[in-house]
Swiss-Prot record:
GO terms for biological process: cellular response to heat; cellular response to UV; innate immune response; response to bacterium; response to heat; response to oxidative stress; response to UV. It comes from the Eukaryota. It is found in: Secreted. The keyword Secreted applies. Belongs to the Turandot family. This is Protein Turandot C. Residues 1-21 form the signal peptide. A humoral factor that may play a role in stress tolerance.
Length: 129
């Protein structure tokens, strides 16, 4: 009895990583969502407000990317986001855009829109190949 429970636990440990991956359905859904965000974000405010959603899509996609693609996009993200700290320690995956919900000067607004377009374009290229 004890051996069968141990064997079952071992089998679950071997199978569990395959259940945590980024499925083709999720990838297709995120691809369509990125395209929708880019097409429907016509004004500056909507671009700035939807940047966080693009960041969330990148977080889901990141483990399935090549190290080069991930690093390239993460460099850009680090320039334009603030790290979320909990008790002075960065939270796991904790970054938020610097621009959402703030009154921005024209220069900062231009940076925020440029970041939205850069991130959206990078994600779109990753999905379309």
């Amino acid at each position: 009895m004890n051996a069968s429970i141990s064997l079952l636990c071992f089998a679950l440990l071997l199978i569990s990583p395959f259940c945590l991956g980024y499925s083709d359905e999720e990838r297709e859904s995120d691809s369509l969502r990125v395209a929708e965000i880019l097409q429907t974000s016509k004004d500056d405010e909507s671009k700035i407000n939807r940047t966080q959603e693009l960041l969330d899509i990148f977080r889901r996609l990141a483990p399935s990317l090549s190290p080069e693609d991930r690093e390239r996009i993460e460099r850009s993200i680090k320039e334009h986001t603030d790290e979320i700290l909990i008790d002075g320690v960065p939270s796991q995956g904790g970054r938020k855009t610097k621009y959402v919900g703030k009154i921005l000067s024209p220069v900062a607004q231009g940076l925020a829109i440029g970041f939205f377009e850069e991130l959206g374009g990078s994600l779109s290229r990753l999905f379309t190949g």
